[in-house]
Amino acid sequence: MKNIKKPYVILNAAMTIDGKISSKEGDSEISDEEDWKEVHKLRTQVDAIIVGKNTILKDNPKLHIKFYEHNGYYRIIIDSKLSIPIDSQVITYKPETYPTIICATENVLQEKVQEFEARNVKVIKNGKSSSVDLKKLMLNLYNLGIRSVLLEGGGNLNWSF
């Protein structure tokens, strides 16, 4: 087997029997408490969790671990234009335990990068078009020592991998 320099990716997605991940109204609460405990257990077993910017904009999650002992992990946000609010919980909640990395395109304004870096957020810039180059990103993450990631969507991001 050849040495592949990218993290192992695990997809976690709750969906209905007909393959939907949210209702027409956008409600994505499909999971029950037992499901959430399993998600948090999975989070204890990876080096990073990846979500897209829409998850942050819609839910403002902490992306932390409850129910289990752990050492923390990286929170990785795919946000080509650095458009999430600087005061999002993913940035402000326990950054020493859950450091945040935002992946943007090379076109993003340096002032925006500096704004996030001032909050101890690492910004990785790759992708010359309007979207982040996910193949390059995987190599970037591997080079940071990240060997496993839990992909928690949303839908567009899930299908991009």
Language-model segments: what does each one mean?
Residues K2-L144, N156-W159:
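Active-site ligand-binding patch in enzyme domains
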